């Protein structure tokens, strides 16, 4: 409050998602910030109605993905995305194994299962999947968008990836396992 009262101007990058919950919070932000930078055009009215100067600057993921990767579903690929943090990978891999087992038992044996991995989880995932009914192919994270474009369906951790898959029009089951 002292900084605000001192006359400093405050610019906030990435608008709080008041459109998702508690839209009335926008009024509070209008009292704090002098200017707000939002990802999407539809966010502007939530803040401008309270007099907060708000500018849509685009979304770094959406702007780079939408229209760039065309669906190429000639292969039968089911992509498993257990996340990028080791804690979530350890929590979700048993669930992913159960899902793969069920899919294989129910006629999806001829599908290729793929898991994009980051460097910090690749070794762990490789050790976990070696004895699955069908061993998934591991690919580096740098190739994930090419894989997503070929994906029939994805089973993904909740997070940024679910937004990426939606932008690429990949049918996705989002999974989350609580402690």
PLM-predicted stretches and their roles:
Residues 10, 54, 111, 136, ...:
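Hydrophobic anchor at the start of a short beta-strand
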Residues 141-179:
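A donor-sugar binding/catalytic signature common to diverse glycosyltransferases
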Residues 13, 39, 57, 116, ...:
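Generic beta-sheet signal
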Residues 1-70, 80-92, 102, 118-120:
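Active-site and donor-binding regions of nucleotide-sugar-utilizing enzymes
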């Amino acid at each position: 409050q002292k900084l605000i009262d001192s006359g400093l101007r405050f610019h906030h990058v990435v608008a709080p998602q008041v459109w998702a919950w508690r839209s009335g919070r926008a009024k509070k932000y209008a009292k704090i910030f002098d200017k707000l930078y939002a990802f999407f055009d539809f966010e502007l009215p939530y803040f401008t109605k309270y007099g907060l100067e708000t500018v849509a600057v685009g979304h770094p993921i959406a702007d780079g993905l939408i229209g760039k990767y065309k669906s190429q579903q000639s292969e039968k690929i089911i992509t498993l995305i257990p996340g990028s943090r080791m804690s979530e990978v350890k929590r979700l891999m048993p669930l992913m194994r159960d899902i793969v087992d069920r899919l294989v038992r129910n006629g999806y044996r001829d599908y290729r299962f793929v898991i994009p991995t980051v460097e910090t989880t690749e070794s762990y995932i490789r050790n976990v999947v070696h004895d699955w009914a069908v061993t998934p192919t591991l690919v580096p994270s740098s190739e994930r968008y090419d894989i997503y474009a070929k994906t029939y369906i994805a089973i993904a951790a909740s997070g940024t990836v679910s937004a990426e898959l939606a932008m690429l029009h990949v049918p996705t089951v989002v999974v989350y396992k609580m402690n």
